[in-house]
């Protein structure tokens, strides 16, 4: 069902905070490592954004698509997904220590972490805290990653914790080069994210 995977994507999109730096990286590709480090440091300073876009999800037995709204304010998030014709609407809000998932016509669910909520509701174990980094074009910190740089010293692809992420295009907003279209491939799950509107902000701590 689309709703099942809509909830899955919402939970994948959760975060463990925007601070942190220094993932263990293996670099390859055509980019310049020094330029990559400067690009990475700039993007790591982003601790606020608003994203509007579309998400497509494909699994072995079903698939679906919907719209995405993601508001990030340091460690607080408000993520909303809506399926075609309003079906499968879900909203996830919270910060480290408390997560609330509201699903249209189904109910309200709470957990201490996005990982716990995902396992409780769907029985799946996924690196749900990584997408806050991946959506900015960064590897998640404190986890080994294999990175391929493009000619502009930005990520062309990354492999991390059993997931492969492809960066198909970037867009420049407020001096930041940010992913515009990306594909995520995990075990039995493929996700395509197209960002229509990026509003990055550096809020400070």
UniProtKB/Swiss-Prot annotation:
CDD domains: LolB
Keywords: Cell outer membrane, Chaperone, Lipoprotein, Membrane, Palmitate, Protein transport, Signal, Transport
Lipid metabolism found in the keyword field: no
GO BP: lipoprotein localization to outer membrane; protein transport
Localisation: Cell outer membrane
Lipidation (S-diacylglycerol cysteine): 18
Subunit-level organization: Monomer.
Function summary: Plays a critical role in the incorporation of lipoproteins in the outer membrane after they are released by the LolA protein.
Protein name listed in UniProt: Outer-membrane lipoprotein LolB
Organism for this UniProt entry: Pseudomonas putida (strain W619)
């Amino acid at each position: 069902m689309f709703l099942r995977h809509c909830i899955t994507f919402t939970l994948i999109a959760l975060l463990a905070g925007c601070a942190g730096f220094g993932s263990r990286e293996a670099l390859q590709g055509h980019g310049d490592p020094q330029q990559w480090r400067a690009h990475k440091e700039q993007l790591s300073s982003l601790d606020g954004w608003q994203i509007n876009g579309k998400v497509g999800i494909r699994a072995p037995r079903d698939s679906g698509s919907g719209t995405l709204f993601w508001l990030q304010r340091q460690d607080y998030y408000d993520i909303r997904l809506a399926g075609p014709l309003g079906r499968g609407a879900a909203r996830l809000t919270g910060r480290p220590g408390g997560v609330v998932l509201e699903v249209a016509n189904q109910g309200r669910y709470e957990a201490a972490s996005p990982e716990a909520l995902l396992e409780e509701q769907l029985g799946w174990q996924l690196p749900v805290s990584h997408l806050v980094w991946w959506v900015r074009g960064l590897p998640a910190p404190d986890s080994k990653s294999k990175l391929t740089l493009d000619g502009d010293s930005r990520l062309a692809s990354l492999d991390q914790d059993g997931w492969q992420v492809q960066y198909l295009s970037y867009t420049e907003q407020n001096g930041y080069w940010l992913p515009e279209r990306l594909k995520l491939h995990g075990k039995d799950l493929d996700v395509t994210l197209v960002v229509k509107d990026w509003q990055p902000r550096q809020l400070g701590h």
